From Swiss-Prot:
GO CC annotation, single: glutaminase complex
Name of the molecule in the record: Pyridoxal 5'-phosphate synthase subunit PdxT
Source organism, top-level taxon: Bacteria
GO biological process, one term: glutamine catabolic process
Binding-site positions, L-glutamine: 49-51, 110, 139-140
Function, as annotated: Catalyzes the hydrolysis of glutamine to glutamate and ammonia as part of the biosynthesis of pyridoxal 5'-phosphate. The resulting ammonia molecule is channeled to the active site of PdxS.
InterPro entries (UniProt xref): Class_I_gatase-like (IPR029062), PdxT/SNO (IPR002161), PdxT/SNO_CS (IPR021196)
Species the sequence originates in: Rhodococcus opacus (strain B4)
Family: Belongs to the glutaminase PdxT/SNO family.
Length: 202
C-alpha cells in the first residue's frame, strides 16, 4: 500500500486542511459524507468542530453506526480536538444525548481549556515523533483525564503550561490516535505522517 486512501469526515471543521495535510503526508485523501464511502477507505480522520453538533450530524447522515462498526473491525482513525472527544469512551461536560464512538479507552473533558478567547499555543514533546518540539494550537480544546491500560500517552502540556501543565493532550490505542490540538493548521505534517504510517502498517 504505497498511498493509502484516507477519508476525512466532511461534516464540519478543518476538512480542507486535513485533506491537504494527508496528501502531503503520502496518502490519497477524500471527503466522507455517506455510509457507503466508509467501505472504501483504509483510514479516517475526524476533524475538529463542535462535538455535540458533530454527533448529531453523524446520526443525520446515518454514519454513526456504520462508523462504529468499522472502528470495531480495526479501521485506523485519527481525531483532532472534537475528533478526540468523539473517539473517547467517556466524555465529561457534554449533553446527555450526545453520541460518541468509544474507540479509545479514555475519559475526556470537553472544552477543558476554556472558551475560544482562552485558546493558546504551546511546544510539545510528542512520543514517536523526532525532531524539534511540536507547536500545538489549542482552540476550546479538550484534555484527557483518564486513560485505560492499553492507551499510550503521546504528549502532555509542558510544565510551563500554567494551570494545564501535565495534562494529557495526545494518545494512541492500537491504530487509533487522538490529539486535543489542531496540527492541520500549523503546517507541521508530522502527526499526519505518523497516522499515514499507522494506516500503511495495518
Amino acid at each position: 500500500m504505497t498511498r493509502p486512501l484516507v477519508g476525512v469526515l466532511a461534516l464540519q471543521g478543518d476538512v480542507r486542511e486535513h485533506l491537504a495535510a494527508l496528501n502531503d503526508s503520502g496518502a490519497d485523501a477524500v471527503g466522507i459524507r455517506r455510509p457507503e464511502e466508509l467501505e472504501k477507505i483504509d483510514g479516517l480522520v475526524i476533524p475538529g468542530g463542535e462535538s455535540t453538533t458533530m454527533s448529531k450530524l453523524l446520526q443525520i447522515f446515518e454514519l454513526l453506526e456504520p462508523l462504529k462498526a468499522r472502528l470495531r473491525d480495526g479501521l485506523p482513525a485519527y481525531g483532532s480536538c472534537a475528533g478526540m472527544i468523539l473517539l473517547a469512551s467517556e466524555i465529561l461536560d457534554t449533553r446527555p444525548d450526545a453520541q460518541h464512538l468509544g474507540a479509545i479507552d479514555m475519559t475526556v473533558r470537553r472544552n477543558a481549556f476554556g472558551r475560544q478567547v482562552d485558546s493558546f499555543e504551546s511546544d510539545l514533546e510528542f512520543e514517536g515523533i523526532v525532531g524539534d518540539p511540536m507547536r500545538a494550537v489549542f482552540i476550546r480544546a479538550p484534555w484527557v483525564e483518564r486513560v485505560g491500560d492499553d492507551v499510550q500517552i503521546l504528549a502532555r502540556v509542558p510544565e510551563s503550561g500554567g494551570a494545564a501543565a501535565g495534562r494529557i493532550v495526545a494518545v494512541r490505542q492500537g491504530s487509533v490516535v487522538a490529539t486535543s490540538f489542531h496540527p492541520e493548521v500549523t503546517g507541521d505534517r508530522r502527526v499526519h505522517e505518523l497516522f499515514v504510517d499507522i494506516v500503511r502498517g495495518v
